[in-house]
Amino acid sequence: MEKKILFPQIGGIMHGGDYNPEQWLDRPDILEEDIRMMKKAGMNCATLGVFSWSTYEPREGEFHFAWLHDIMDKLYANGSYTILATPSGARPAWLDETYPECRRVDSYGVREHHGVRHNHCMSAPVYRKKVSVIVNKLADEFGNHPGLLMWHISNEFGGECYCPHCVKRFQDYLAEKFDHDIEKLNKAWWTTFWSHTYNDFSQIEPPYRNGEFSIMGLNLEWKRFTTWNMTDYMKAEIAILKERTPQIPVTTNFMKEYDGLDYHKMQQPLDVVSWDSYPRFHNDEESFSDTMTENAFDHAMIRCLKKEQPFMLMESAPGLVNWHPFNKMKRPGVHRLASLQAVALGSDTVQYFQWRKGRGSFEQYHGAVVDHLGTDDTRVFREVADLGEELKKLKDLAGTVVKAPVAVLYDWDSLWATDGMKGLAESTRNYIKTCRKAYRNLSALGVDVDVISSEEDYSGYSVIVAPMLYLLHTHVGERMKQFVEQGGHLIATYVTGYVDENQLNYLGGFPGDGLKDLFGVISEEIDTLYPSDRNCVHFAEMPEGEVRDYAEVLRVADGTNVLGTYEQDYYKGMAAVTERTCQNGSAMYIAARLDDASMQHLYARTLKKAVSYTHLTLP
């Protein structure tokens, strides 16, 4: 079993969470009790300083770190390490008052007021300067502390800014990308439509809601720029810490399959990837099993950002959250189940937000290990403590690297392009849900599944599943062809390969970029079904399948096997599912959105050829 130990100091699985002692500095009795109860809960790490800027620096240039020295010393003396965050996720009032350009401008061009969090401009030079000051101070004060285990960069990056600084950086970003050739950009974005041709990069604005949002290429590049700009900002923080403390690893906490940032790009400067997991347990829209499988998809997606090592579950709620539409309490045993699921899928940590509930403000009712009751005599605390003991017994799992023979392709570019397209049906495109469904149906067959980018290396996988890969980068088609020629098995679905990286349609038939030859099909039409519409697919070797939402009408090339045909409408009798073999590999095309049972049968058909698993649960 391959291993890579992230934190040898821990000697096992990390167990901890966000701790906010700055909220309790006037209650030394509570701070002392925290140390006692952390030991009782089996915690060996605490995340500090996430939102501590106004405590560190209550007035510009006036710094207070003695309280944090005291806390870190006591934690370390009691066997607990510290993950120390840079506090740039939320700004003190003096900063916004003195430097208003730090505040974001929204998509209508309006400057936001001071308040809440995660609403700072990543481009503002003065903001970057003030962040560099506090980050340097933290490195000076705590870089050599024996209890410092890791740096946590800011918190849950997200959002967009449309201020003049960001507009100028966007224009410069585009000029660099398109070789300072405005005609190259015009061609890539098809700007002659509606007479939107640009004469100079200085004319380009972001997609304001009260401005230009009709150019698909512009909208897509704005999303990419936002990822680039935030990553550039994050790298500036990391550079300071790496110069001062090169031995200390860095991370930041990602959020589910957050649609605002491309984590495949953003993970690159990090040493370890981590994320915050908050499933909607016990909701009335899906089964408990589906909730767990969706969470497993998220774990796999995060894990595969750095497949060669474990990831970190940076935040989870031991009880409930306070921001879901309905904040239902985890039932007994569910916290243990969800935590062990994370470990089984490759996490070397189980961590919480938060250790102790605050008395006021936005997250006063967010779940915590220690409730407002303030004791260790609660169900939640007992479950956390029991889990702490169990994690100690699982210490040998630390460092385990998960290897999967099957991968589902998930691309932020395809997500953004699919969400932003004007076509099909907005309510049923559902790119993320379609990828999750593929993961769920493969997992139901008992196979381990990765979730990777289409631009990653496919070697090591036997089966690649590409659900609705609407945007196909021009080099990916050739890589898919090589994968199949080398014995791999590729499965793609409807709405694959319609546009290139600029969101221009491929010409000559879909799927584009050579995939029509690989699959031996051309999608001539796509029928968008109303929610009440149904069709069926007849299979010779499996039960009839139900079709909802989308059905492509295919032209099938010679040498392509038809596995299923439509039973209704004007395309009755025409191909709905096909397969084409190539040496020892195969390429299956599923032209309609089929029910789960049918998808599992089709996946099983390929898995039987591709994966040597004695424990597969195949229909």
List the predicted regions and their residue ranges:
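N-terminal carbohydrate-binding accessory modules
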Residues: 1-45, 397
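Short, well-ordered coil/turn segments that N-cap beta-strands
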Residues: 11-13, 42-44, 78-82, 144-149, ...
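The substrate-binding groove and active-site-proximal loops of carbohydrate-active enzymes
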Residues: 15-25, 52-66, 113-130, 157-160, ...
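Short, acidic/polar
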Residues: 24-38, 256-263, 331-339
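Aromatic-lined substrate-binding rim segments of carbohydrate-active enzymes
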Residues: 32-39, 47-106, 237-244
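Polysaccharide-binding and catalytic clefts of secreted carbohydrate-active enzymes
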Residues: 109-297
